[in-house]
């Protein structure tokens, strides 16, 4: 018997109409995953009226199998999120800073934005106090660029080696699965650089009234590289055109009693009504030689850049809700590693770790082909030798899965090379030299109104109250070092030993 000509056989099958659903069934007829039409989806097959269910009931088995596998691993952080789509329009010529096409004046780039809470789980109330994620995927002409940030402009730590410990401290007690402030402050009493961001967290900025009403920040310093190879350090900031609105403690209680999803409901509802939220994108810019002029390290993620001018470079409008939450919001893979030529990571120690960690955790959640999912696919062609992986649905015809090759060249482009960084010295494991852990936190406290200070002091003090005595007094001494009124007032609420606090604060150096 001659071998079957598969290509010819497929054509014949197609022509005969044998691989499509027979026309005797309506196109909206219920089918199984193999395309076969279902005869009954309400009653299982049984052995008679009183007998057991039959193993041959493949519709029942498939429904249960698929149901048992609906969930993928929850994000370790940023689990609860809301995704929306929109467009970014560049408005300023910054070709002197970056060769990235996304910044070309007038360039319009589709975006996907995922807002989120950070610490709490996927089904937690959105009223819980938390930093809030503000991550934007730009589908640019140079490939996908992800600006993965938060509503706070600073972070709790400056070195990625502390990240797993910080998250563990924030998460519930592994013994009881209950929140435990004492564990958190046991950790943070060893991390004085955290207090500026802790101040933000316990202020009303930790409970925004809506995603539309909060700013976004890239948090880290990045490097922009122009066509000449010249490097500038920048920080990115989204400014809400809806204004900033937060909930005070009384409002939090009122909202939570009625709506566990107030952030999502507000955003989705506004877009559904045609009230499209907008944000302007700004950059702060420093030349490499300017990094040394500050009394703190500008590449420290726990710091803002005071007095460095901001330049508006574009505007984003969010105008479409997702079509399917799981396929888009849950499967979107945001990662600082997704960069394009003209945008590079700085030497920020936290960012360097996030470049690996975020891409790695997305691969763990979604598998090796996660970036091939529709929400993650770039708008430009992908051309490399990466192959296979579970659930690979691509159609690859090339026999060349390596590089270099004469059979099928995939040349690199020198214009996409990374910038060069002059280095000297030896390898080390040491703290940064310009920590300045206290000044910016004190400045932040003093910037708040009287009511904002009162709300902050009350929330921070209540959280500290049941903390182990030594950790409590250390935390209070840091607050006292930042601003004596701040430390004194929180100590009153937390019932700390003020004389001990003052003594500890006297030994601290900024």
From Swiss-Prot:
Biased composition (Polar residues): 386-400
Matching InterPro entries: Catalase (IPR018028), Catalase_AS (IPR024708), Catalase_clade1/3 (IPR024711), Catalase_core (IPR011614), Catalase_haem_BS (IPR002226), Catalase_immune_responsive (IPR010582), Catalase_sf (IPR020835)
Main location, first listed in the record: periplasm
Residue numbers annotated as active site: 78, 150
Cofactors required: heme
Binding site for heme: 358
Protein name in the entry: Catalase
